[in-house]
Structures are given as C-alpha cells and as structure tokens.
C-alpha cells in the first residue's frame, strides 16, 4: 500500500455491501446494510401492502444486475437477510436518496428515487447504450450470415482464433447473401439431417458473434471455450425460436421450411423430444407474447452468454464477465423504459430475464441427454460438434 493520511485509513476499511443484491451499501436501512434501490423497494412493498408471485418456485437469483427481475424473490431476500418491516413508519425514512456516510470508490449510480429507475444519463450510460445499438446491428448481420451459403470446414480452435467474419465488410458483402436453399417454398417435417444442419450453422454463427464482444475477446482461450461450450445447447434454441416464421405456438420453422411441432419423434432420443416441448412452451410462447424486438433479443442473448458462473470459467475472468453483463443489463433496462415507459418496463425486464432460468434448466437437462446420446451412438455428432460439446481432446 502506498501513501498515508486519510485515504490509507479509508482503504483499510472493508466496503459494506447490500445484503440483498450485493451492490454498495449506502448505510443501514431497516436493520441491515442495503443500497437505496433495495431500501426503496422494501419500503414501497410494505407501505403499499403489495404481494408478488414467482414463476419459478421462488428460486430466482437476486443480485445487482438482475435485482428487478423477480419482485417476489427480491422481497423474500429482503426478509431473509433481516429487514424489519416493523421499522417502517409513515413519516420516517422517506423514500429518496440517502447521503453516503462513508467514502467509497466512485461507482456508477444505477438506482434513483424509484426502484430500478434509470439514473441520469452519464458518459458511462451513453457508452452502454451505444453498445446495445451495436449489438442490435450485429444481430442483423448474424441473420444474414446464417442464411448465406457460406459454411467453412474448420476445427473449433481454428474457428475461435480466426479473424471475425461479421466485422469484415468485404467478406460480408461477398458472402452474406441469401442462399436459394434457405428460401421457404413449402413446409416439411424436419428430419435428423435438418437438425444437424441448422445446429452446425448456428454454432458457426455463434462463434463469429462471440468474437464481436470485447469482453469475450479479452478472455484467455480456455475461458472462451468454456463460454462457447456453456451456450452450445441454448444458443441454437434461442435463435430457432426468435427467427421462426409464425405458424402458431406449436410449430418452429427453420429457414429452409423444415419444421418441428408436438408430433412425437420416436427415432430421436427422449431428452431431445423433451427439449422441443420446452422450446415451444417455455420459450416460444412467452417470447411471442412479449413481442420481443431485435434489440431486446440481442441483449438477452449476450446477457445469458456472458455467464460468470459457466462451468470451467476461471475465477480471474468472473469479474470481467460480470461487469460486461451488467453493462448490457443496464442499457437494456433503459431501452425498455424508453420503449414502454417506467411503469411497464420493470415487468417486461423481469419477464425477459427470467427466461434465463428456463435456458439454464434446459442446458443442464440437455447436457445429460447429449452425453447419453453420444455414448449409445444415438446421434452421429460431427468432429466439430464433439469438440464444442465435450471439449477438445489433447493427445
């Protein structure tokens, strides 16, 4: 430690964090250290005698990046950490900003007088908002590359270390052209070759998309592989659902007209049949109901991808991923406030982020199904797919 004086003494004191969401605490509110956002949320809930319900058995995560997602779980967390409802009185502790009583390192304020309201626009906010716009435009490029004829034959290592194709304007102008194969002229029931074809294409695009994310590019190679492996099952599912033409809530259509619905497929492993029912019921229906736009989809996809808790991600990369994810989450919420207004934005924001719980559950179940299918040779995975799903074997 360098230097002396007051700053030395201050730096030796551990920062107190909000026991509810782990943001920086602004002091003790209702008996526990908490931030202004959680203090305000708890007070409003008690004063208005509000009750909430949870769509996911009360098991939603509550942290500073997604604390607005599920109000039921957030309120339960307030009670669990010891917030005292009896400490709230009508004329005491009015809702508003509480001056910090200790000097903390400068942080970006993400809460204002209302729960999860966007802070005043700062340079940081503008940077985050600009990146959200970039994510949306990149998503359009992903769609173009997905529908093109171009499909390289390469190993996973070659795919990850090569230059990003989506940012190569010359390449995109020459190759990102709609393939005649990907024009829907009629519908036909998908077979195993169709599933294989579209998963391989979506994995190819996923890697090129990941390379447009500065956070991903800053990671060591092993952490990049861990993130790609973590999303190898869920990324195609999201893309299939979002880009499917509307043929009802029981049908998902690939760009070439192949489709699947609730029709049982006895030739496919049991776990894969379960996955398609999950996609229809837990992804397609809510996403169609919300009418998610390109920007919201692009942000949600990135938030789920940049998971600091993904298997095999090194501890040194977790903060980088968490910060990158939080920046996108902040920008997404501000975007929703502008689009829907503050009153509806919180509910929409929460409903979208809670789809991450669906994806996480799907990933765990499908990982086991994939291992079983490979062990019993129920599905013939390509070399590239095996490298992505099971890891790169070293001699």
UniProtKB/Swiss-Prot annotation:
Keywords: DNA-binding, Metal-binding, Nucleus, Receptor, Transcription, Transcription regulation, Zinc, Zinc-finger. One of its GO terms (molecular function) is nuclear receptor activity. One of its GO terms (cellular component) is nucleus. A zinc finger (NR C4-type) spans 18-38, 54-78. Coiled coil: none annotated. Residues 15-90 bind DNA. Its main location: nucleus. Disruption phenotype: RNAi-mediated knockdown abolishes expression of acdh-1 when diet is supplemented with 5 nM vitamin B12 and high levels (40 mM) of propionate. RNAi-mediated knockdown reduces expression of nhr-68. Residues 152-392 form the NR LBD domain. Pfam families: Hormone_recep (PF00104), zf-C4 (PF00105). Belongs to the nuclear hormone receptor family. This is Nuclear hormone receptor family member nhr-10. It comes from Caenorhabditis elegans. The lineage of its organism: Eukaryota, Metazoa, Ecdysozoa, Nematoda, Chromadorea. The gene is nhr-10.
């Amino acid at each position: 430690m360098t230097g002396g004086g007051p700053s030395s003494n201050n730096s030796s004191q551990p920062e107190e964090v909000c026991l509810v969401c782990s943001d920086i605490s602004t002091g003790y509110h209702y008996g526990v250290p908490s931030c202004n956002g959680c203090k305000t949320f708890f007070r409003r809930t008690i004063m208005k005698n509000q009750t909430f319900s949870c769509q996911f058995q009360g098991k939603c995560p509550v942290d500073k990046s997604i604390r607005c997602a599920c109000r039921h779980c957030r309120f339960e967390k307030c009670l669990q950490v010891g917030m005292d409802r009896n400490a709230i009185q009508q004329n005491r502790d009015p809702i508003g900003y509480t001056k910090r009583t200790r000097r903390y390192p400068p942080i970006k304020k993400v809460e204002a007088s209302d729960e999860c309201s966007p802070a005043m626009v700062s340079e940081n906010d503008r940077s985050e908002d600009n990146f959200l716009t970039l994510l949306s435009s990149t998503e359009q490029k992903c769609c173009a590359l997905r529908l093109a004829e171009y499909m390289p034959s390469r190993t996973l290592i070659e795919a990850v270390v090569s230059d990003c194709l989506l940012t190569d304007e010359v390449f995109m102008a020459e190759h990102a052209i709609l393939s005649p194969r990907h024009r829907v002229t009629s519908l036909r029931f998908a077979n195993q070759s169709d599933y294989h074809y579209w998963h391989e294409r979506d994995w190819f695009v996923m890697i090129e998309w990941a390379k447009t994310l500065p956070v991903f590019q800053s990671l060591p190679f092993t952490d990049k592989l861990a993130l790609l492996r973590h999303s190898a099952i869920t990324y195609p599912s999201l893309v299939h659902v979002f880009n499917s033409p509307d043929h009802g809530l029981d049908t998902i259509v690939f760009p070439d007209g192949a489709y699947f619905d609730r029709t049982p497929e006895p030739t496919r492993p049991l776990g894969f049949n379960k996955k398609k029912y999950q996609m229809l019921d837990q992804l397609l229906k809510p996403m169609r109901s919300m009418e998610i736009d390109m920007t919201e989809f692009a942000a949600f996809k990135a938030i789920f991808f940049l998971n600091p808790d993904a298997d095999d991600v090194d501890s040194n990369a977790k903060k980088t991923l968490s910060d990158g994810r939080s920046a996108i989450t902040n920008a997404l919420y501000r975007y929703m406030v502008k689009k829907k207004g503050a009153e509806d934005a919180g509910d929409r924001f929460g409903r979208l982020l809670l789809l991450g719980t669906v994806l996480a559950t799907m990933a765990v179940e499908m990982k086991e199904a994939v291992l079983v299918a490979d062990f019993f040779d129920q599905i013939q995975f390509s070399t590239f797919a095996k490298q992505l799903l099971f890891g790169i074997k070293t001699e």
